[in-house]
C-alpha cells in the first residue's frame, strides 16, 4: 500500500532528526522519535550480530540503546548521511522503511586517534500513535566498515 505524503514527511523528518540528534549528542530528544519499547539490532555483512568486546549491538528498549550510544559517543564525533527511503504501508498504523546510510566516526581530537567509515541499510518499522509516527524497530545491516589509526 502506498504511503501518504503526510506520513512520509513525518517519518523522513524524524529520521533526519535521528541522525542530527546522534551526531550532536542530543540523547534526551530520542523519545520524540522512538517508542520506549523500540528494539534495535545491528548486523555484520555475514548476518552475525555486531559486537564490541562482550557487548552485542542488540537492545530491547530506547532507554538501553540511548544509554549505550550516549556513553560510546562521549569521545567520538559522528556524521550520518542518509539516502532517500523506500517506504511501504503494511497496515493503517504501520510503515516499513529502508534507508541507505553512510557514516563517519572518529575521535574528537584534531590529531591522531582513529577514524572509521561505514555504510549499510537501516530496516525500520514505524507505528502510528494518534496523529504521529514513531520508530518501533530498527535493524541495521552493515555492508562496510573500515577503521584507520590516524
Curated annotation (Swiss-Prot):
Pathway: Secondary metabolite biosynthesis. It comes from the Eukaryota. Keywords: Lyase. The keyword Lyase applies. The keyword Lyase applies. It is an enzyme of class 4 (lyase). Its EC number is 4.2.1.-. SUPFAM superfamilies: NTF2-like (SSF54427). One of its GO terms (molecular function) is lyase activity. Gene3D superfamilies: 3.10.450.50. Pfam families: SnoaL_4. InterPro entries: NTF2-like_dom_sf, SnoaL-like. Probable cyclase; part of the gene cluster that mediates the biosynthesis of the tetraketides fugralins such as linear fugralin A and cyclic fugralin B, volatile compounds that play a role in the asexual reproductive cycle but are not involved in pathogenicity. This is Probable cyclase FGR4. It comes from Gibberella zeae (strain ATCC MYA-4620 / CBS 123657 / FGSC 9075 / NRRL 31084 / PH-1). The lineage of its organism: Eukaryota, Fungi, Dikarya, Ascomycota, Pezizomycotina.
Amino acid at each position: 500500500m502506498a504511503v501518504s505524503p503526510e506520513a512520509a514527511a513525518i517519518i523522513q523528518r524524524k529520521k533526519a532528526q535521528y541522525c542530527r540528534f546522534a551526531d550532536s549528542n542530543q540523547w534526551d530528544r530520542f523519545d520524540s522519535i522512538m517508542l520506549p519499547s523500540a528494539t534495535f539490532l545491528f548486523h555484520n555483512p555475514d548476518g552475525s550480530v555486531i559486537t564490541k568486546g562482550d557487548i552485542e549491538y542488540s537492545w530491547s528498549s530506547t532507554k538501553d540503546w540511548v544509554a549505550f550510544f550516549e556513553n560510546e559517543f562521549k569521545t567520538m564525533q559522528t556524521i550520518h548521511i542518509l539516502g532517500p527511503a523506500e517506504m511501504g504501508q503494511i497496515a493503517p498504523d504501520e510503515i516499513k522503511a529502508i534507508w541507505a546510510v553512510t557514516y563517519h566516526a572518529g575521535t574528537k581530537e584534531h590529531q591522531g586517534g582513529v577514524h572509521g567509515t561505514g555504510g549499510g541499510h537501516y530496516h525500520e518499522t514505524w507505528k502510528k500513535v494518534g496523529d504521529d509516527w514513531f520508530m518501533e524497530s530498527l535493524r541495521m545491516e552493515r555492508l562496510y566498515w573500515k577503521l584507520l589509526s590516524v
